[in-house]
From Swiss-Prot:
Protein family (similarity comment): Belongs to the RNase PH family.
Functional note: Phosphorolytic 3'-5' exoribonuclease that plays an important role in tRNA 3'-end maturation. Removes nucleotide residues following the 3'-CCA terminus of tRNAs; can also add nucleotides to the ends of RNA molecules by using nucleoside diphosphates as substrates, but this may not be physiologically important. Probably plays a role in initiation of 16S rRNA degradation (leading to ribosome degradation) during starvation.
Catalytic activity: tRNA(n+1) + phosphate = tRNA(n) + a ribonucleoside 5'-diphosphate
Record carries keyword Transcription: no
Alphabetized HAMAP family for the sequence: RNase_PH (MF_00564)
Protein name according to UniProt: Ribonuclease PH
UniProt source species: Photobacterium profundum (strain SS9)
An MF annotation (GO) of this entry: tRNA binding
GO terms under biological process: rRNA catabolic process; rRNA processing; tRNA processing
UniProt keyword Secreted present: no
Keywords, ordered alphabetically: Nucleotidyltransferase, RNA-binding, rRNA processing, Transferase, tRNA processing, tRNA-binding
Known partners and oligomeric status: Homohexameric ring arranged as a trimer of dimers.
Amino acid sequence: MRPSGRSTSQVRPITITRNFTAHAEGSVLVEFGDTKVICTASVEENVPRWLKGKGQGWVTAEYGMLPRATHTRNRREASSGKQGGRTMEIQRLIARSLRAAVDLEALGEQMITVDCDVIQADGGTRTASITGAMVALVDAVNSMIEKGTLKKSPIKGMVAAVSVGIYKGEAICDLEYLEDSAAETDMNVVMTEEGKMIEIQGTAEGEAFSHEELLAMLALAKDGIADIVTMQKQALES
């Protein structure tokens, strides 16, 4: 039995609130249960130096957590003068995932930066960030079309993510903190709306997992992400 009473395949209640802030071209508050992340997409009419003159755009991301997003206060990374390894890993994952959804040549020499700020963490912050960031990215692109800086959308399709794992010997989907902290295996999966894999990050925290357990986790991820993509599209239509 899971702490929340959910079935093994059930994701947490998910809410995607668009236009959450006033100034960004795209902004979303995404909630996976008690995990809450603000995702803002900002457009710049330039690209990194190494892309200048190449006729393509760029999508990047930054990630951070408020000091009291967790049970105990974490020191702000800015106060130590550098980002931690976990932060850098997560923001690179978010950026790679978003770029898989975009035709960078069709974007032209423009850059979109998506900032993902965790205001409350209860497991799955990176997967929630990717899911919310994708919606914010679509809104930013639509804003560019309205302003005339893009003629058509470079979005190839939706991208979403979910965590899966082995908890008490059973494969489960969308782990909350109590499950994540006690899981034998923890895995994050990013997929396209067609069910193609973008990234799989999996680690056995205790006992090694079998090939059969891997397939079970991936099957849960595929079904969970399909449900999440449906929620993304519903949010964009609202």
